[in-house]
Amino acid sequence: RGTPAGCTSRAVVRAVARGGVIRFDCGPRPVRILMTATAKVVNARGRRVVLDGGGRVTLSGAGKRRILYMNTCDPAQRFTTPTCQNQDHPRLTVQNLTLADGNATGQRQEGGGGGAIFVRGGRFKVVNSRFVRNRRTSAGRPSGC
């Protein structure tokens, strides 16, 4: 059985970059993980990324940063097809998780976007999750979460 001490921002960032199914094992009580960096999906690492908080995990941007980022057109996250706009992967699923206090204000890439999650391309699905006190940028389209 895991403990809250093992559930860190660094562990989340590494797990998201690796891809696959990520099930948090932080013990029996609710836990808040303060993200010290944005977790970025690496497009070429796998077709599926699932974050499952089991209903007990909150990822917090601490009012300082975006929590999750997936962009099929960002060369730093590696292209997997000649036309990044039409890519059907990766498939990011956020389930049984709370994303709180994410902040994208001041972000300029791709017109800003959501405070909790930025998604361009691929597929994105939310299941039984909450978004609380996230701040999107005022630039660009009025979208994002």
Language model regions located:
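Extracellular beta-strand-rich solenoid/capping regions of secreted or surface-exposed proteins
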Residues: 13, 18, 34-50, 58-95, ...
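Acidic Gly/Asp/Thr-rich repetitive segments characteristic of extracellular carbohydrate-active
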Residues: 1-23
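N-terminal carbohydrate-binding/catalytic regions of secreted carbohydrate-active enzymes
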Residues: 26-34
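Outer-membrane beta-barrel translocator domains and adjoining extracellular loop/strand segments
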Residues: 109-110, 139-142
